[in-house]
Amino acid sequence: MEVKTLDVANFLARIQKQESTFESLSKFSPTQLKELATCIRHRILEVVSSNGGHLSSTLGAVDLIIGMHLVFDANTNPFIFDVSHQAYAHKLLTGRWNDFSSLRQFGGLSGFCNPKESPSDYFIAGHSSTSISLAVGAAKALALKGSASMPVVMIGDGSMSAGLVYEALNELGDKKYPMVIILNDNKMSISKPIGAISNYLSQILTTSIYQKIRDTIKKVLTKMPDSATYLAKRFEESLKLITPGILFEELGLDYVGPIDGHNIELIIATLQRAKEMRKPVIIHAQTLKGKGYEIAEGRFEHWHGVGPFDVSTGSSLKSSAPQSPTAVFSESLESYLTDEKVVGVTAAMPSGTGLDKLIEKYPQRFWDVAICEAHAVTSMAAIAKEGFKPFVAIYSTFLQRAYDQIIHDVGILGLPVRFCIDRAGIVGEDGETHQGLFDIAYLRSIPHMVLFAPRDNASLQQAVAFAYRYNDSPCAFRYPRGSFTLEEGVFVSNEFVLGQAEMLKRGKKILLVGYGNGVGRAYKVYQALITEGYEPSLLDLRFVKPLDKHMLNEVFKTHTHICVFSDSYYMGGVASALLEFMAEENIKDVQLKSFEIKDRFVPHGNTALIEQSLGLDTPHLVSKIKEWI
């Protein structure tokens, strides 16, 4: 029985009880589905304006996600969202409407899909371009189980730039596993519609007529005599030439679109047809980022990821903050651009890494290569070989995606590529997939790699200066998101000298060793211990590779307890480096304790609350140290 009027309260009550969204939505009329989309957008705006999050992409994907849940049962068909920052509507339709107010909060809902949060989230997501590979694997598993279910993928046009997508499409075009891939094109970066002809093609391609023509031609081809086969094949190929999806067609996939990603009736009809085809189908849907929120519709990039804001004006509710490390890095790097050998690259994060203004001012020397971290690194290796000074500005979590290239293309030849690692350490609300905690461990093992870290904005300027001067091997320096823990001006900033640490405070017995942002944490502990009558020393390690062996040999002779602080993992991290040094030097009369992060993935939430949960806030640290000594 069709629902006469959209009773949102009753509908939401049903899905809160985990009743089937699939069955409930099937009773809605197109008008009611549009009303539901409006309600979902209002809820997203309500929460994101309070908590922050990804806004414009998720507003644009609402209609498509409603269509997915109406045509496919998410309980039996794996819904796989690439990155999944656009999947808020999916969360709201799968029993999380009330809990949505906890989005990105410590202990609350993740800003991305996570099976630990809900069985409706098929797979963890956060990094781009993994969805089609996951879908291929899921389709294989379903086939092995004898299931008629199929994966349903949503992937954005930005994610289509990464090589992993085409590795998956290569196999998919050969094996023909049944699945539906929705290409959510919200930037018009793949194919822009052109007038009436484009509209006409879109209408043709979203009906069964086009597919019937293609299927009929293929059947006829098998029955034609050899003399006519050539002409028939050419006729079939000519059909591809009038579609925007030639690339996908040539890979052996069926392409539908482009369609209007906000026309709910068209979306449902297209998805239903794709479902019936029982083969890999790509639906190219064009959507508007920020759909339903007029202020966001006009400023796409600004509204991609946002902090709390006033819905009525769009104004940020964040209080003024000191200059971010990202901004300091950008300004510092620009000061060296009188040297025409200085160049830079980022992978789809120009504003996030501070290279956006440099790309605008110096387009011949700074590049955004899209979501292609591996290509970014390898291309800079060649530039370094030609005598230039490349700076690779990249988030810690995304540099992981280019690890082979760092070793094979940069490391083996010892090329002087500078890795500027933004968002190092605990990044807060983006959670497990984005915490920048691995870089020290995975870079420290690479022969001849130099690793160093600033403690505040002033020393970050010195770090950029050192990277500019250093030309003997690859090097990397890391800095946090938002701000350093250490307040500006506490210590005078000196030049970085290869492999030299800096003693900030001399005391006795207890040595607090900080690295990078860990210096700020160590300094807070230092202040607390001083008030309780202790006299610790405070050392800024500055370089974790190479270590200042002369300084370490000196201080290890005069201290009995070494406390190590760094925003990184213990395994392979700073304490590991110091323990290796102690083993090599046969130092036995010193105890060392790491206050890094142990063997666990760190969840999302406010950074201070995360640190408290990990026992890394000052009261916990001081208590542990006092108990230890």
UniProtKB/Swiss-Prot annotation:
Which reaction(s) does its UniProt entry say it catalyses? D-glyceraldehyde 3-phosphate + pyruvate + H(+) = 1-deoxy-D-xylulose 5-phosphate + CO2
Q: Which GO terms describe its molecular function?
A: 1-deoxy-D-xylulose-5-phosphate synthase activity; magnesium ion binding; thiamine pyrophosphate binding
Q: Name one GO biological process term.
A: isopentenyl diphosphate biosynthetic process, methylerythritol 4-phosphate pathway
The record's free-text note on cofactor binding:
Binds 1 Mg(2+) ion per subunit.
Q: What does this protein need as cofactor?
A: Mg(2+); thiamine diphosphate
Keywords for this protein: Isoprene biosynthesis, Magnesium, Metal-binding, Thiamine biosynthesis, Thiamine pyrophosphate, Transferase
Q: Which residues make up the binding site for Mg(2+)?
A: D157, N186
Q: Name one Pfam family in it.
A: Transket_pyr
What is its pathway?
A: Metabolic intermediate biosynthesis; 1-deoxy-D-xylulose 5-phosphate biosynthesis; 1-deoxy-D-xylulose 5-phosphate from D-glyceraldehyde 3-phosphate and pyruvate: step 1/1
Q: Which domain of life is it from?
A: Bacteria
- Cite the Gene3D superfamilies for this sequence: 3.40.50.920, 3.40.50.970
Record-listed E.C. numbers: 2.2.1.7
* Residues binding thiamine diphosphate: H85, G126, H127, S128, G158, S159, N186, Y293, E373
Relate the assembly described in the record: Homodimer.
Q: What does this protein do?
A: Catalyzes the acyloin condensation reaction between C atoms 2 and 3 of pyruvate and glyceraldehyde 3-phosphate to yield 1-deoxy-D-xylulose-5-phosphate (DXP).
Family annotation (PANTHER family): 1-D-DEOXYXYLULOSE 5-PHOSPHATE SYNTHASE-RELATED, 1-DEOXY-D-XYLULOSE-5-PHOSPHATE SYNTHASE, CHLOROPLASTIC
- What family does this belong to? Belongs to the transketolase family. DXPS subfamily.
The protein's name is: 1-deoxy-D-xylulose-5-phosphate synthase
Q: Which organism is it from?
A: Helicobacter hepaticus (strain ATCC 51449 / 3B1)
Q: Which gene encodes it?
A: dxs
